[in-house]
A protein has these predicted regions:
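Catalytic cores of histone-lysine modification enzymes
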Residues: 5, 11, 17-126
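C-terminal SET catalytic tail plus cysteine-rich post-SET Zn-binding segment of SAM-dependent SET-domain
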Residues: 2-20, 117-206
């Protein structure tokens, strides 16, 4: 299973992801349904603040260069059945990381909680938990990513208000299946979705 890994953001140790998956599958008790990973992290070059009808968002305080890490997702790994028992605010502050697994942050919002969707985002996923700037982000611009790159369920579907020319109008858990988005975000899907896309394309993957 491997030794505990070092948290990139705090220097503390956490349980390796494969250990968490094994624990969830081997022990369905309440204690096994919640496992602490890392806290959410937001670059000091950005700040979470009110964002009108979106609620809150994260905005650049200084210029962020393409390729810079801007946020890291952490929290509790839970299954969909457990996610559905949480209050709506915590459900909205979650990200899907595997077929039936989600990262949910603490009851009190953390700096990295407020990363909104955009159909033409300023950041993209690297792996399942890290966001990097997809282009240069100017002061005052919002840090966003496309939920199509991580979602495969209906837990967070909504009418989009990103305002981009490429806006899809509605964001669903099936958007990752679109050929145009698979081409646009090639290399930037959460690993479990990247594997599924590869399989659908006839590639031999795990």
């Amino acid at each position: 299973m491997g030794e505990p890994l070092l948290n990139n953001y705090t220097g503390e140790a956490h349980v390796p992801y494969d250990c968490i998956l094994a624990g969830l599958r081997a022990n369905p008790t309440r204690e096994a349904r919640f496992h602490r990973l890392d806290k959410n992290w937001l670059t000091p070059k950005a700040q979470s603040r009110p964002a009108g009808t979106k609620g809150h968002g994260s905005f650049a305080l200084e210029k962020i260069s393409r390729g810079e890490t801007v946020a890291g997702f952490g929290g509790w790994v839970v299954t969909r059945s457990t996610l559905d028992t949480l209050d709506l605010d915590r459900q909205h502050r979650s990200i899907q990381v595997d077929e039936d697994l989600y990262l949910v942050s603490d009851e009190t919002p953390e700096p990295g909680d407020h990363l909104n969707h955009s159909c033409h985002p300023s950041a993209v996923l690297i792996g399942s938990q890290v966001l990097v700037a997809w282009r240069d982000i100017e002061v005052g611009e919002e840090l966003t990513f496309d939920y199509a790159t991580c979602d495969d369920s209906d837990y967070d579907e909504f009418t989009c208000g990103c305002g981009e020319a490429q806006c899809r109008g509605t964001v669903t858990g099936q958007d990752w299946k679109r050929a145009d988005l698979q081409e646009k975000y090639k290399g930037y899907f959460s690993p479990y979705l990247a594997r599924r896309i590869a399989k659908e394309n006839g590639e031999d993957v795990l």
